[in-house]
Amino acid sequence: LLWVCSFCKMKLQTGKKTGGRMMQNLEQFLRLLTGHFDNREQFNQMQKAEKVYPLAEHVNTVCNDKIRDLPADFRGKFLVEESYYETNGKKHASAHLFLFTEEQDGVLLTSYEIPEGEDKNSFTYASMKPVDYGDLKKSEKFTPALYREKDGVWEGGSTSQFTPVMKFRLWERFSEACLEVSESIEVNGRRTFGYDDPIRYKRV
């Protein structure tokens, strides 16, 4: 019995250490991802090369403080991603709500619908109203993306089948240097949105 108790205690301590390491991974990942970023340096290079490319801006903010009744043992982090693009003088904004959770082999991104009652066209962290955790809905179209870390660099992505003929591809790499984001949409196998080079966001 003494041996069993000692073994259980050892397993419990090991579990705590593993959980701690996992949370450290999530914190490291979010430290790279959260903040205010733009690709102005890359945009200027593309302008000099006379290539059509967007001037893009990302504002990423953890928003657990705006979500009520999170489970007591909840360890994930919800994040509002605000994106702003300008191409040939035309401006476009979009926003997403993501949940990041620590998994055994990396960090998982799960997309959620913008909360009911919010304006999808102007949704931001600042405008987000408090919402109950139970009212949040996962996106049925988006395939969760898994990110793995190697030498301080996180890389991952996913492919989502939005409709029988429309496919969305996401690939991202996050490091201290920049956030690299590649998004494309294919319809019937033909790319209708996206660029050859990933957008390189640097912290503002």
Give the predicted meaning of each segment:
Residues 22-25, 144-146:
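Short N-terminal helix-initiation segments at or just after the protein's N-terminus
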Residues 23-36:
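N-terminal helix-cap/turn-to-beta initiation motif at the start of protein domains
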Residues 1-22:
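Short, Lys/Arg-enriched N-terminal segments with co-localized hydrophobic residues
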Residues 2-3, 32, 149, 166:
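Alpha-helical structural elements
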